[in-house]
Structure formats: structure tokens, C-alpha cells
Amino acid sequence: MQAQIVNKIFEIFSKNNPNPKTELIYKNDFTLLVAVILSAQATDISVNLATKSLFATYDTPEKILELGEEGLKKYIKSIGLFNSKAKNIIALCKILISNYQASVPNDFKALIKLPGVGRKTANVVLNCLFGMPTMAVDTHVFRVANRIGLAKGDTPEIVENELLQIIDTKWLTHAHHWLILHGRYICKARKPDCDICPIKEYCDYYFNLK
């Protein structure tokens, strides 16, 4: 996709939503990290429902560790893969306390070494908490990028690298939020709402429908 078209797409996103935010609800750096881990193969809505009562009392690594793995499972059992997620979060809490003074590191390599943290989670944390121009590629971003012709790739990492190359630096702080929200509410998986899409005139998928 030509640079001027990419720029136009993000100009439209920016005009329609100047300051996009994650839809995950969190209280501090640690609770965002936990929420993003829980959001893997789950919806933000389901995560927010589960963490509302959890974070009301247990919002630090020390408190989650005190709650314990079985106690944590009781709060997050409505979320997919809750057994493995609980195990990872408890292990993560121990590492944060012992290695990072119970703080969330602001380094990609340090983050992806934490249990339950992959590229997407690390990039979300770096972007949302520390304002870094990262590109977190979830299922929505992967689908939208390929569908509209923004970035073609067979894996999230390939799409991530393509997007980082073609998106102007000035858009990168908000770019992954715009793409996620576009995929969640307009460019849906089964049936995209092309009629209300603000960027359809620049979209490969829409062009091929004609």
C-alpha cells in the first residue's frame, strides 16, 4: 500500500478518534499487565467482568501472591485457559517482586521473559503504560491489516514488522488501538460493516467487492 494512502487512513482514524484507549479496565501498571495476560483468547468484556472484583482487593503482586493460585482461579474461572493463566500470573508476581521491586519493567526483552507474556502482551504494556510506539498485533489487527491491504503476512510478527515500516512515526502511539477498535466494531471477522466504514475507499477488500 502506498505511503500516502496509509497516511490518509490514519488521518481518518485520528479525526474520528483522536485519543483512543484500551478497553481493558485497570488500576495501575500491574493490573494492566494482568488484564492483558487474561485477555489472550478472551474478550475485553469478559476480562473486565472478572477483574472488577479481583482488582478491588488484589491489585499488587504481593496481594495476588497472598491470594494464591487457587484463590486467583476463583476470580478468573469465567475466562478461557484460566488454569494456565493463574499459574503464570502467580509465577510472574514472584519474579516482579524478586527482580523488579514489584514494578512492571519497561523493557521488551524483560517483559517477554515473564510467564504468560508474549510479543503482543509486551507491546501493549509498553504502549499503554510507557507511551512507546509499539505495534501489538492481536487477532483484530492481524485481520484488518491483511484484509484492507495495509500489511500482508502469515504470522502476527510479520504483520507487526510490516506495520512498523509503513506507518508514519506520528501515528504509531495510537495505531494499534485504532486498528483494534476498527476490527472490533466495523471490520468484523465474519461480516465487516463496509457501509459504515470510514476508510472503505482505501480498502482492498471493499474494492474487490465492487
Swiss-Prot record:
Highest taxon above the source species: Bacteria
InterPro entries in the cross-refs: DNA_glycosylase (IPR011257), Endonuclease-III-like_CS2 (IPR004036), Endonuclease3_FeS-loop_motif (IPR003651), HhH-GPD_domain (IPR003265), HhH_base_excis_C (IPR023170), HhH_motif (IPR000445), Nth (IPR005759)
Entry's Gene Ontology BP terms: base-excision repair, AP site formation
Disulfide topology: none
Presence of the UniProt keyword Glycosyltransferase in the record: no
TM region(s), chain numbering: none
CDD domains xrefs: ENDO3c
Cofactor(s) needed: [4Fe-4S] cluster
MF terms in GO: 4 iron, 4 sulfur cluster binding; class I DNA-(apurinic or apyrimidinic site) endonuclease activity; DNA binding; DNA N-glycosylase activity; metal ion binding
Note on cofactor: Binds 1 [4Fe-4S] cluster.
Reactions it catalyzes: 2'-deoxyribonucleotide-(2'-deoxyribose 5'-phosphate)-2'-deoxyribonucleotide-DNA = a 3'-end 2'-deoxyribonucleotide-(2,3-dehydro-2,3-deoxyribose 5'-phosphate)-DNA + a 5'-end 5'-phospho-2'-deoxyribonucleoside-DNA + H(+)
EC number: 4.2.99.18
Binding site for [4Fe-4S] cluster: 187, 194, 197, 203
Keyword set, alphabetical order: 4Fe-4S, DNA damage, DNA repair, DNA-binding, Glycosidase, Hydrolase, Iron, Iron-sulfur, Lyase, Metal-binding
Top-tier EC class: lyase
Domain HhH, residue spans: 108-127
Known role: DNA repair enzyme that has both DNA N-glycosylase activity and AP-lyase activity. The DNA N-glycosylase activity releases various damaged pyrimidines from DNA by cleaving the N-glycosidic bond, leaving an AP (apurinic/apyrimidinic) site. The AP-lyase activity cleaves the phosphodiester bond 3' to the AP site by a beta-elimination, leaving a 3'-terminal unsaturated sugar and a product with a terminal 5'-phosphate.
Family as reported in the entry's similarity comment: Belongs to the Nth/MutY family.
Protein's name according to its UniProt entry: Endonuclease III
Originating species: Rickettsia conorii (strain ATCC VR-613 / Malish 7)
